[in-house]
């Protein structure tokens, strides 16, 4: 982890979002700020559905650089701001390389990702942030 934080500092990044796992499955997002060291700034429990789980077969090329993340907020409460902060996104952003769609669901907030350069439909994965209203 120390090497990851050093690399982030060297490249001028202000945050590192870590997907923590349990028994090989995503279990939480952990946010580190490189200048604060190995102290977790925020942790959010999650569940995830992969592209395969969602039945998506369209090939999606990864973005190889930091892109702008726009947020489409359908939740409208403090949970939206917390999730946007994890990803370094502003709730006011309306255009970006990736659009993060936040919707309320039974367990908390469903996070879907849309890549306007590929499709107007979600491209996966689908993440549920387990957060109470």
List each language-model region with its residue ranges.
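Phospho-regulatory, Ser/Thr- and acidic-rich intrinsically disordered linkers and terminal tails
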Residues: 1-133
């Amino acid at each position: 982890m120390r090497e990851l934080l050093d690399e982030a500092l060297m490249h001028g990044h202000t945050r590192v979002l870590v997907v923590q796992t349990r028994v090989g499955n995503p279990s939480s997002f952990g946010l580190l700020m490189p200048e604060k060291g190995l102290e977790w700034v925020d942790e959010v429990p999650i569940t995830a559905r992969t592209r395969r789980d969602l039945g998506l077969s369209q090939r999606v090329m990864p973005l190889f650089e930091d892109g702008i993340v726009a947020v489409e907020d359908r939740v409208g409460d403090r949970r939206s701001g917390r999730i946007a902060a994890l990803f370094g996104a502003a709730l006011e952003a309306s255009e970006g390389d990736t659009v993060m769609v936040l919707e309320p669901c039974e367990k908390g907030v469903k996070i879907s990702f849309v890549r306007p350069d590929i499709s107007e439909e979600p491209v996966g994965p689908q993440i549920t942030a387990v957060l109470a209203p």
